[in-house]
């Protein structure tokens, strides 16, 4: 969560390192993911460029479709409901009333509990994965050479039906 006047302990050095890169002319891009739902303007204040997903960009004559990956493709009803709650302005306001110590403990506990409850690495479901389905549909309307996403925290390299590379 992004408070107006508080930077979470342990992250200042990361922000300082990113700022040092930007001071040397390196552009730093940021995609909001499922753990970053409540970031607002702080990254832009630091000089980062926030991109909405999916972002189409041309690099070296090739077209890339890049994004975090969260929420792209067909999403199960339960997850859609949860995403709706996290994107709700009233709930965001109510959460902002919590002291940062409480809010960060809740957020970190939720995140850690979610990861630890699986007890194993995520196994990508191939062509039945919602993100892959998104890419297969997206390339029907846009010429794309490479899809690059995160979100699943696993390594995937495969081809889409249209021949683009699909990387997670």
Residue ranges of each PLM-predicted region?
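Short C-terminal domain-edge/linker segments immediately following a structured domain
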Residues: 20-25, 59-63, 94-101
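Core catalytic region of metal-dependent phosphoesterases/phosphodiesterases
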Residues: 1-59
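Short, surface-exposed linear patches
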Residues: 12-15, 51-53, 73, 86-90, ...
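Membrane-proximal helix-turn-helix segments that form the acceptor-binding/catalytic region
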Residues: 19, 113, 134
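Short, charge-rich amphipathic segments
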Residues: 12-23, 67-76, 116
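A broad, low-specificity signal for short, low-complexity segments enriched in glycine/proline
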Residues: 13-14, 22-30, 106-110, 125-130, ...
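Conserved beta-sheet core of the metallophosphoesterase superfamily
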Residues: 46-53, 63-65, 70, 75-82, ...
């Amino acid at each position: 969560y992004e408070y107006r006047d508080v930077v979470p302990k342990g992250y200042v050095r990361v922000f300082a390192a990113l700022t040092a890169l930007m001071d040397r002319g390196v552009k730093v891009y940021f995609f909001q993911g499922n753990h970053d739902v409540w970031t607002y303007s702080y990254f832009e204040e630091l000089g980062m460029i926030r991109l909405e997903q999916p972002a189409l960009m041309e690099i070296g004559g090739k077209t890339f479709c890049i994004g975090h990956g969260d929420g792209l493709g067909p999403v199960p009803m339960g997850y859609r409901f949860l995403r709706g709650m996290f994107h709700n302005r009233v709930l965001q306001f109510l959460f902002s009333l919590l002291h940062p110590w409480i809010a960060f403990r809740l957020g970190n506990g939720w995140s850690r509990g979610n990861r630890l409850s699986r007890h194993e690495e995520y196994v990508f479901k191939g062509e039945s994965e919602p993100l892959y389905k998104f890419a297969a549909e997206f390339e029907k309307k846009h010429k794309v050479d490479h899809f690059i996403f995160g979100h699943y925290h696993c390594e995937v390299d495969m081809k889409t039906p249209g021949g683009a590379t699909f990387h997670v």
